[in-house]
């Protein structure tokens, strides 16, 4: 900040004088300025999230295409395989099963890659981070299912650089299955792939969606704290998931196969909600039975 000095002040231009006066007299004592200086960090985070929303709005064509591909698979009696390791499992569970969602998905949640709530010790974070970079694990996971070209796949990975999601996308493509990758593009671009050939998840994707978060994911910088906090990829990822879900539900309904949407009893009544839950779970079981029936073929 330019410190006030009567002698030097005379030598400044008009605009420079205004800046010096503002910095030295108006800024320090103005309560409104002080309020801005102490801006609530939660408000700053929400502003960053608004920026993520804007980035997702720019991906309408990709969202529509993903919904169209998913609808084609579900209407043909097949499924959309959804996979994510680490925190990316959140997006898998957001797609199905939860309120506002419906059958047609194969949620692949491998506990060895995602159940690390203990952080340290048995089932800890170290093991999960190690396992998501074990080559060949993706093949072992997919060996459980009978895949079909009519399927589609959604692979979620913020960095797009870990081996298991990359190899899973590669295996799906080898089977002729279209792959949608949900990544954080800025983070992916600045990260190094764990594959020796340097290929990333997006190299095995037919369609790429961007969560809109920054490189490193965290969005808020705090004075005297070296590293930023409060990530944004989950916020963006969930908005993309539910945008696709809405478009997909419309397509299924327009095609004469309205989805069985898990709905709260407070919305449609306990009896009807229970009936829909049972019907939705049965449909899911029948679709999964087809996958298991043809495993290994």
For the regions a language model picked out, list residue spans one by one.
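Residue-level detector of alpha-helix boundary/anchor positions
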Residues: 1-2, 197
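Short, low-complexity, charge-dense intrinsically disordered segments
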Residues: 2-32
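Conserved N-terminal alpha-helical segment that immediately precedes and caps sugar-phosphate-binding
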Residues: 23-24, 32-297
């Amino acid at each position: 900040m330019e410190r006030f000095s009567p002698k030097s002040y005379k030598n400044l231009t008009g605009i420079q004088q205004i800046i010096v006066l503002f910095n030295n007299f108006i800024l320090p004592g103005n309560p409104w300025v002080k309020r801005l200086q102490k801006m609530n960090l939660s408000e700053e985070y929400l502003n960053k999230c608004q920026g993520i929303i804007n980035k997702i709005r720019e991906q309408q064509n990709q969202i529509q295409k993903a919904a169209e591909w998913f609808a084609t698979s579900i209407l043909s009696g097949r499924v959309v395989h959804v996979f994510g390791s680490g925190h990316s499992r959140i997006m898998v569970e957001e797609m199905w099963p939860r309120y506002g969602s419906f059958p047609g998905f194969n949620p692949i949640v491998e506990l060895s890659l995602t159940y690390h709530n203990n952080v340290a010790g048995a089932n800890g974070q170290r093991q999960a981070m190690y396992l998501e970079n074990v080559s060949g694990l993706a093949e072992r996971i997919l060996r459980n299912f009978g895949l079909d070209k009519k399927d589609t796949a959604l692979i979620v990975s913020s960095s797009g650089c870990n081996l298991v999601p990359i190899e899973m996308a590669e295996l799906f493509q080898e089977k002729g299955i279209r792959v949608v990758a949900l990544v954080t593009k800025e983070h992916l671009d600045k990260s190094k792939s764990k594959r020796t050939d340097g290929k990333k998840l997006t190299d095995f994707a037919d369609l790429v969606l961007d969560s809109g978060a920054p490189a490193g994911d965290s969005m808020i910088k705090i004075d005297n704290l070296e590293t930023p906090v409060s990530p944004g990829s989950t916020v963006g990822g969930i908005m993309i998931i539910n945008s696709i879900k809405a478009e997909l539900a419309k397509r299924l309904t327009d095609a004469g196969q309205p989805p069985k949407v898990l709905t709260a009893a407070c919305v449609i009544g306990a009896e009807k909600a229970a009936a829909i839950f049972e019907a939705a779970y049965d449909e899911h079981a029948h679709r999964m039975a087809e996958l298991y029936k043809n495993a290994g073929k």
